Every structure is written in structure tokens, then in C-alpha cells.
Amino acid sequence: MNKVRIRVRNFGPIREGYTQDDGFITFPKVALFCGPQGSGKSTITKLISSLMWLEKAAYVAAWSRPELSISSSEIFKRLALWHNLGSYFQSNTEIDYVGDGIRMQYRGDKFSLYPNVGDDDHYQKPKIMYMPAERNFLHYFKNSAPVEQPPLLALFREYVKAEKHFASGYDIPINGYRFAIDNNKESVIVNIHADGGEAKTPVGAASSGIQSILPLLLVSDYITRCIGQDSILTPDTESMSVINNPFVTISSERGEPFFTDSDVKINVPSFIFRAKQANGCFVNIVEEPEQNLFPPTQRNVLRKLLAISKMLDNNRLILSTHSPYVVSDLVASTKAYRLFEKANELGDAEGRFKGLINEAYALDSAMDSSDICLYETSYDGTITRTMDEEGRLKDSNYLNHQLKLSAMLFDHMFALEHEMEQELKSRNG
């Protein structure tokens, strides 16, 4: 799998950005961004979503010129508005993107495309899904409230299809709950009690945690299954419209398609072929997978997302989080992977060690550390990498540091309590 890279400076809360590796942030199979509120986590995830979509649009438009410079950067800025990033651009903003077959660059008011390799035959068109933090919209079904924000609307449409796909039932990693569509064609959460009794709750009345993870897991699983099993039958209809492609302009005089801001005609047969071509992989971009969830459930949801990402070789999972539990469990996934490898080296024929490891951390979710990058955003506008090549979390990690501060606070208060008790004993003689 190729590692997509971006370099960002002076964009929203991002100032200097990442200062190692020539400033390029790497996106392997799994990338996670942590850090305090307003430090740029979602800025990076929204930006990579936009850039990957632009690469896909350029591929569908059959762009093959040595270079395409668009003097007006409105294409890029218009797309950024989809994620409400329009106000993040500054006069000194610098953005570079290195994808599978295309490089993109934004400087000043100029947006340029360059070939990354000799050809793009290896490019696998992705289905890109952005899971916004504001995804607990299931009560809308009951209240018939509109979904207006573009990311939410896109997720809502996929969720409707996912519900139908999993109508017979879908297990949720919360206390044995299960999603299903009942005989009355109502979407419900089924809870089986210890005595065998069954309780059903309409999804719109379910807990905030269930409303947060149900769209996330159903849509993630549904998209990957469609790509992995039925790709021939599920063409990428979202790319088929010329109107949706920012690199295509229809001549008002002749009604012919041209590359935007140029006099070069679009190769129509190639455009139609690529537009109808099925997606070959899934890029799943998730804001705050831990939202409204108890720590054990946070870990269960992460492991489910990791397992889904492993269903196809070229799937990618990009996460932003505030949760130390999500960070620590992602690191634990690399330890589990190394233990599985050691079990193979031991020739664990009976599977004793593998069974014990699997009980602790399922093999389906275990990740090679080389397939993971973990970054931390800071209030000063910088980005640092916080997991080493062996899968170990660095002590400087912000969330790790906060956990240590909490432990130190308790130690300090226990010491004060002990001192006060000793003082009380001395007074009472």
C-alpha cells in the first residue's frame, strides 16, 4: 500500500505544522490524530478528505497532462467549504499533497496538479466517507428534521442504504445489543435480557452512545462489504455526473467538456469509463470514535473499525480523538500483532498462545506498527509524531501526560490526607 502524504502550513490553527520528514505527514493504513480542542486534529482530517476527493476527481476526468495550473484556486476553496474550512486560508497558506498518482500544490492563489508517477494504472479509486462528530442524528427519523450540513447529508444517505442492507440484524459492541428492522418495518435496538426476555427500543429513542456508533459502524461495514463482494454490481454513481467534477467545464458555445481553466478537451470515453468504474477501496475518516461512549465501548468500537479496515488491502482508516483509551488501545493493537508473530515463530501448532492472545485482543483487529502513524496536534500550531516505529507511545504524548498528571494529583491528595490524619492523631494525643 502506498503512503499518501500531505504537508500543511498556515492553515486554520495549523502554523508550522509537522517539522520532520520535510514537513510531510504520512497516511499509512491507519492514522490517528490526538490533541486538545481547537489544535487542528479535524482540520487535518477534513483537509485530507478534500485532497483525496480531488485526486479521485482528477482521475475520473482522465487528467494526464504533465502539469495543470489553475490560476484561480476557487476549485480548492469551493471544496473546502464542504467542510466549513473556507475561512482557514491565509495569504501564506502552503498545502502539498502526494497521492498514488497525482501531486497537488496550493500556494497563494494558485492550485496546481502534477503527475506523481509515469502512469496511474496502479491507482485504485476509493470510496471516501467522512464521519463527522455530529453524527448522532437518528432522532431525525422520528422528528423528520432536515439534515443540511453536507458531511451529515452524505452520511445520512449512506446510512439509509446501510439500514436496509443489515435489516435482518447487526450486532453492536455495547452489552450485546443488536440493530434490526422489526415486523413493523421500524428500526429498533434489541436488548436480550438474562432471563431470555427481549426489549426493543426505536433507534431514535436509543441512548446517545448508540446513536453515535450506529451510523458509524453500519455505514463503515456496509461500504466495505459492497466494495469487497459486489463491486461489479455497485458502480461509483457519485462520480458519474460531469456537474460534480470540479475539473470539468462545459463550453457554453459548443457544449463540449474541457479541463477547467484550460482549452484542453476532456476524453469523453475515458471519462465515462472511469466514472462508471466501481470503487476499489474504502477511505474511512472518523471524527471522535469515542463520542458518548464508556471506555470499554470506546475500545470495542476502535477494534471493530480496525477489523473493517483490514477487510480490504487498500482500505484506510483516519481518526481524530480526545480519548486516551482510543490512543492506548491502538498502541495495544501493535503489541497484539507482535505477539501473534511470536506465536508463529514458536510453531504454536495447537494454537494455545494464539488462543490466549486472541482472548485479549482479536487477531482481526491487531495491526502491524508499520501500518500505523499516530500524530499529536498542539495549540502552538505544530504537529508531532507520538508513536515510534516499534509501536511504543512516547512519554511526551499529551494524553499520556494528562493521565500521569491525574495519577500525580491523586498521589498528592493521598499524601495530604495521610498528613492530615497524622496531625489529627497528634492533637488527640
Which residues does each PLM region occupy?
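Conserved hydrophobic alpha-helix in the ABC-type ATPase nucleotide-binding domain
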Residues: N300-L305
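Conserved D-loop-proximal element of ABC-family nucleotide-binding domains
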Residues: F294-P295
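Loop/turn-to-beta-strand initiation segments
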Residues: C281, D313-I318
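Walker A/P-loop NTP-binding motif
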Residues: I48-L54, V219-I223, L306-I308
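P-loop NTPase switch/coupling surface
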Residues: M1-E186, I272, M311-N314, V327-S328, ...
